[in-house]
């Protein structure tokens, strides 16, 4: 028996758990981030949105909090609901993607500027030393990017 077959034999009983690990991590993270914004509207977030000139900051901040809790719960519950849960999981994954794109745009847009500038400017010297740029490190290693891509995974895959 080669090592690959041996590892397959060990992992086989746990293969059904793999998506649940991702589902529970993403769902719990979103639920906790959303609950942390209660009671509604979240005052600190409203003040921050006002400072950025966002229209109806109380409504937007409340929708973000409710969206986080709802998407997190739907990611988890969608896996338990069989075929009807497939659609719920995909919609929740899409909601996670939308929320995370908004979070990255509003709170972390400087990461993109740092990350993309060398490519846009065509500065080969800077491109070869990207790891020295703070935005590059945040962009690649951030929790936000992992949450975004986990949401994308569930939006594409659903319960399949």
Regions found by a protein language model. Give the residues of each.
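Extended, low-polarity transmembrane helix blocks
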Residues: 1-40, 58-160
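Perimembrane loop-to-helix junctions flanking transmembrane segments
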Residues: 45-56
């Amino acid at each position: 028996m080669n090592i690959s077959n041996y590892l397959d034999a060990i992992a086989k009983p746990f293969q059904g758990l793999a998506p649940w690990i991702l589902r529970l991590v993403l769902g719990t993270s979103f639920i906790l981030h959303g609950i942390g914004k209660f009671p509604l509207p979240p005052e600190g977030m409203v003040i921050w949105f006002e400072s950025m000139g966002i229209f109806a900051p109380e409504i937007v901040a409340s929708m973000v909090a409710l969206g986080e809790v709802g998407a997190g719960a739907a990611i988890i519950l969608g896996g338990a609901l069989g075929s009807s849960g497939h659609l719920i999981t995909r919609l929740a994954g899409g909601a996670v993607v939308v929320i995370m794109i908004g979070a990255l745009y509003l709170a972390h847009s400087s990461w993109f500027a740092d990350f993309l500038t060398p490519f846009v400017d065509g500065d080969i010297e800077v491109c070869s030393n990207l790891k020295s740029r703070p935005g590059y490190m945040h962009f690649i290693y951030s929790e936000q990017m992992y949450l975004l891509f986990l949401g994308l995974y569930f939006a594409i895959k659903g319960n399949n």
